[in-house]
């Protein structure tokens, strides 16, 4: 196999799906409500909106007010004898976000993965890091991105 195909087995493709942490602004922890209102002022286009009106639609894209509901991953597995690659995929989706993140962490610690995601550097990776830290989970090596370049 060529070096390209050997390296292909080290790439973990991933995508996360997120949602607001609560169904409505009213259910949000009272300590976080003023923070959401501040955030909402930055994204609000019309000043006539009521506080919390954008919560359901927008909270999921902000790690402080959202949660990871599932993580889809995929990777190529080399079959050297047959000289081919199989693509394997898996979805992590548990009732509790912490369990989903712990399962992902276990996979990330199994080998030295190179992470690949659409807009991963700007969204998926920072979101996962923030949610892991909020849940009290230490960051696995592939998500320790400080100082790394694409």
Please report, for each region that a protein language model flagged, where it lies by residue.
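Metal-dependent phosphoesterase core characteristic of DEDDh/y 3'-5' exonuclease domains
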Residues: 2-9, 66-95, 101, 105-150
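Entry/capping segment at the start of metal-dependent catalytic domains
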Residues: 1-66
């Amino acid at each position: 196999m060529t070096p390209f195909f050997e390296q292909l087995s080290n790439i973990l493709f991933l995508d996360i799906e997120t949602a607001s942490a609560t169904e409505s602004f009213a259910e949000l922890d009272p300590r976080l409500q003023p923070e959401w209102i501040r955030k909402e002022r930055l994204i609000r286009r019309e000043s006539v909106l009521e506080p919390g009106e954008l919560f359901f639609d927008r909270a999921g894209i902000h790690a402080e007010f959202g949660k990871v509901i599932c993580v889809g991953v995929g990777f190529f597995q080399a079959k050297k004898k047959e000289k081919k690659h199989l693509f394997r995929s898996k979805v992590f989706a548990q009732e509790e976000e912490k369990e989903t993140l712990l399962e992902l962490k276990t996979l990330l610690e199994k080998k030295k993965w190179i992470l690949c995601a659409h807009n991963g550097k700007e969204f998926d990776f920072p979101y996962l890091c923030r949610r892991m830290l909020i849940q009290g989970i230490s960051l696995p090596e592939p998500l320790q991105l400080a100082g790394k370049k694409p």
